[in-house]
Amino acid sequence: MAKLHDYYKDEVVKKLMTEFNYNSVMQVPRVEKITLNMGVGEAIADKKLLDNAAADLTAISGQKPLITKARKSVAGFKIRQGYPIGCKVTLRGERMWEFFERLISIAVPRIRDFRGLSAKSFDGRGNYSMGVREQIIFPEIDYDKVDRVRGLDITITTTAKSDEEGRALLTAFNFPFRK
């Protein structure tokens, strides 16, 4: 089992129960899933780019990504409905905890000119979204084998009812928010 999951059960639950005066352990917010999304708009011209992006996402997450397709045609972007334009992975359970641990301790500190993550990226329901400009911050990606630098979106979905609870949950995991 991931160390971060044990830490959540032993430390974070107790801390949040006293902070928010919950009656039951089941009221304490928890991380439900982590979604990684990589939009590859250039895949319209070159299908190989999407395969490389999917390979990067597989290396980062340890799970085969789902190829996302365009919902509707947009003439300005030269895409038709059903064109493959990106890939995404939804992590839950053990893989989610392992990825979350690597994200906090290894990947985020490797971001260039890192001064902390914005605490304003919550959606109103306790879920946190962040964008990463370079996939090479993850140690699983070999810098020499990267065909081009791509960014990805990371969404951490929690069971928190409000942004305040979500922020308290992520702060308990030592999530590096900007002061």
UniProtKB/Swiss-Prot annotation:
Gene Ontology BP, a term: translation
SUPFAM superfamilies, per database record: RL5-like
Pfam annotation, one family: Ribosomal_L5_C
GO cellular component labels: ribonucleoprotein complex; ribosome
Matching Gene3D superfamilies: 3.30.1440.10
Keywords: Ribonucleoprotein, Ribosomal protein, RNA-binding, rRNA-binding, tRNA-binding
UniProt-recorded Gene Ontology molecular function terms: rRNA binding; structural constituent of ribosome; tRNA binding
Coiled-coil stretches noted in the UniProt entry, renumbered to this chain: none
InterPro entries, sorted: Ribosomal_uL5, Ribosomal_uL5_bac-type, Ribosomal_uL5_C, Ribosomal_uL5_CS, Ribosomal_uL5_dom_sf, Ribosomal_uL5_N
Record's function text: This is one of the proteins that bind and probably mediate the attachment of the 5S RNA into the large ribosomal subunit, where it forms part of the central protuberance. In the 70S ribosome it contacts protein S13 of the 30S subunit (bridge B1b), connecting the 2 subunits; this bridge is implicated in subunit movement. Contacts the P site tRNA; the 5S rRNA and some of its associated proteins might help stabilize positioning of ribosome-bound tRNAs.
NCBIfam families, per the entry: PRK00010.1 (NF000585)
Assembly description: Part of the 50S ribosomal subunit; part of the 5S rRNA/L5/L18/L25 subcomplex. Contacts the 5S rRNA and the P site tRNA. Forms a bridge to the 30S subunit in the 70S ribosome.
UniProt family annotation: Belongs to the universal ribosomal protein uL5 family.
This protein's name: Large ribosomal subunit protein uL5
Annotated organism of origin: Edwardsiella ictaluri (strain 93-146)
Lineage: Bacteria, Pseudomonadati, Pseudomonadota, Gammaproteobacteria, Enterobacterales
